[in-house]
Amino acid sequence: MRNDLSGREPAIGDNRGPGSTDGNATCAHGRAGPRCARSQPFDYLVVGAGFAGAVLAERLAAGLGKTVLIIDRRDHIGGNAYDEFDAAGIRIHRYGPHIFHTNAQRIVDYLSKFTEWRPYEHRVKAHVDGMLVPIPINLTTLNVLYGLHMTSVEARAFLAERAEALPDVLTSEDVVVSAVGRELYEKFFQGYTRKQWGMDPSQLDKSVTSRVPTRTDTDDRYFADTFQCMPAEGYEPMFRAMLSHPAITVRLNTDFREARNDFLFKHIIYSGPIDEYFDFRFGKLPYRSLRFVHETLDLPQLQPVAVVNYPDENVKYTRITEYKHMTGQCHPRTSISFEYPSATGDPFYPIPCSDNQALYKRYEALAQQTPGITFVGRLGTYRYYNMDQVVGQALAVYARIEAESCSGERSRPQSAIHREEEAMDDSPLRTATDIPSR
């Protein structure tokens, strides 16, 4: 079986599928599909070729010798981290900026098998009151914004005077107002969050902004993680290397419903939306989507940093990204993208609020009763993960599968949801003004 790479040279795998027939292989509907004679059973069908799916496909093939069919409904691997050269020859991220950062050495060690790294410390500025100032808020932000010359000690006192004491911190608004006061909340967070999430921060769970850093020194790095780098040749080549094992077959432009009718497999790893898998039985889980407008400009550089945020609600986009800052590419022109949040389109972000979590719990309970499938990733577990957290989750799921395989135990079909929280401890969760690691 050839790897379907939309006409490109099929460099992933060796273009062979598993050739033996296994009487234990199953199909959801028990009938042959039009694209396959059902003579090639797979140990695993992996749905989604982003981080969660690619890591598990690679580990199952290389670590346990399993045959894997990995599919994606899009025309490329890499999920939302996919990057490519645009018409001008500039490497861009099709779905907006993806900055790799982590405190987990085990995750760095794993991914380093598939890529070299380019050191990169991400910096973001916010367009506030007609000025570009660092975000997260730091000493420079405060001094520039207010025309002051404070020291770090004075800045701490400045923020303490403005912070509002609240009896309970329950929402995203509460988190920020209790830390920096209402004026800075309104300047930096309120409008941006309303645009990003389509909801007021007072309606969002406190987890959205619970780890927003505020600094009283001049550190203007967006992240404080010990490892901050970009794949030297890009994300797409890294994913290609991950999926190059001969036991892995890749099918693009392939919907899950097609694949489960057309192929034999023993177990499903599913990183798509959990509500979609169950045909929206309890209703749709709310997600935010994004629309990107990419442009190439006839100048070498547009802005001083890779990303500039626009918190003003009168500006319809949330930010502008200039990719050469991140990739280090030398080019006489520059490519940028405008980012517009949307209520419709591909699901990007689970919306964190109590009603949505209650709806997800109903799907989670249903998944726990469904044998033969493991739900992983941001969409499969309806949680807002960073890229490194998704890798950590996938490695933890694999470790469990490996342990059960070595001990002779059968995989736990009744335990279909795998968040693997211990894999998440090294990295903070997403924030309202964070750079999405989609």
Set out the residue ranges of the language-model regions:
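Glycine-rich, N-terminal phosphate-binding loop of Rossmann-like dinucleotide-binding domains
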Residues: 49, 272-273
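Glycine-rich FAD pyrophosphate-binding loop
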Residues: 61-87
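Active-site/ligand-binding neighborhood in enzyme catalytic cores
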Residues: 129-267, 271, 278
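Dinucleotide-binding Rossmann-like beta1-alpha1 core, especially the glycine-rich loop
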Residues: 88-162
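Active-site-proximal substrate-binding core of FAD-dependent oxidoreductases
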Residues: 402-425, 429-438
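C-terminal segments that line or cap access tunnels to active or ligand-binding sites in enzymes
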Residues: 265-266, 276-407
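N-terminal Rossmann-like FAD-binding beta1-loop-alpha1 element of flavoenzymes
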Residues: 44-70
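Extreme N-terminal leader/targeting segments of oxidoreductases
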Residues: 1-44, 62-65, 424
